[in-house]
């Protein structure tokens, strides 16, 4: 009944940095050619959304509807769309997969050229947005915008998933879980019997731990300044956890003593350039690999002694855990349904959508891992 019509619905609009999100009635235009309109059922609160609210990502265009980790149901499709129909369960993809660009054609890469990460144009592929509020056009956020009851997505930025998938759980596959898990199994390529250190034990860091465990690592050391996070980290597979505040020597020296000169794999899951250098320094000089997972503020610069690399360390990273989004998201959902991993330790809070600002406060105060908002 709503197909082809403008839908009025609730959304959380970010009118500018350093202010709470505002619940507004917005208009969502119908999907154009090769677009899909989706009713969002569940959406997670991710640290990257908060980087926009705090002003850390300075290139962002306002006003904007944030949110990029979600699951929902197709409401209607635009002209030329053949792979989706109303009622399909889907996950929006902040890294699209066009299938035609250099990255999509390269099996080693997943960062489709049609993404909006770092550019932050805040529009769909046709250079316009489908959102309006109080007569103003509202920007999109990295191809997704999920803090709204309805969103419009380019069809290259949607994955159809199994009809049995519980949307309030698998929404994590839209960002946090896949980013962390893939950083271990794809980007790091963690080997059985190896030693890993994970810096930052939020939702993504815990997902790195799950990935290290699935990959067969024998030691997984969690590192965080908040010792309250250690219980959940161990539940996810960490074999031990350390707090840098408990030592009067640099953390890479602590790890060197624990691991016969350094870990095989180090993961930075905070987005802090000082910690990135610590992670690199904590990896073994001749054969250690460091994976950057965290998103640093716009102007941040990482500095380190090139000798760290010259001796044989590898420094790498990936967006969205290296997954080719359209291909791999449905497989990850099937793996979840087949109980290859469990999301329950990652989800600490469920909240109604209207309480979105409270959800962000929990994240900022270190009181939550993942908060899932439901409509």
From Swiss-Prot:
It catalyses: a primary alcohol + NAD(+) = an aldehyde + NADH + H(+); a secondary alcohol + NAD(+) = a ketone + NADH + H(+). Its EC number is 1.1.1.1. Zn(2+) 2 binds at residues 98, 101, 104, 112. The modification N-acetylalanine is found at residue 1. NAD(+) binds at residues 200-205, 224, 229, 293-295, 370. The keyword Cytoplasm applies. Binds 2 Zn(2+) ions per subunit. One of its GO terms (biological process) is retinoic acid metabolic process. GO terms for molecular function: all-trans-retinol dehydrogenase (NAD+) activity; zinc ion binding. The keyword Cell wall biogenesis/degradation does not apply. SMART domains: PKS_ER. It is found in: Cytoplasm. Zn(2+) 1 binds at residues 46, 68, 175. Its main location: cytoplasm. Its cofactor is Zn(2+). SUPFAM superfamilies: GroES-like, NAD(P)-binding Rossmann-fold domains. GO terms for cellular component: cytosol. InterPro entries: ADH-like_C, ADH-like_N, ADH_Zn_CS, GroES-like_sf, NAD(P)-bd_dom_sf, PKS_ER. Keywords: Acetylation, Cytoplasm, Metal-binding, NAD, Oxidoreductase, Zinc. Belongs to the zinc-containing alcohol dehydrogenase family. Class-I subfamily. This is Alcohol dehydrogenase 1.
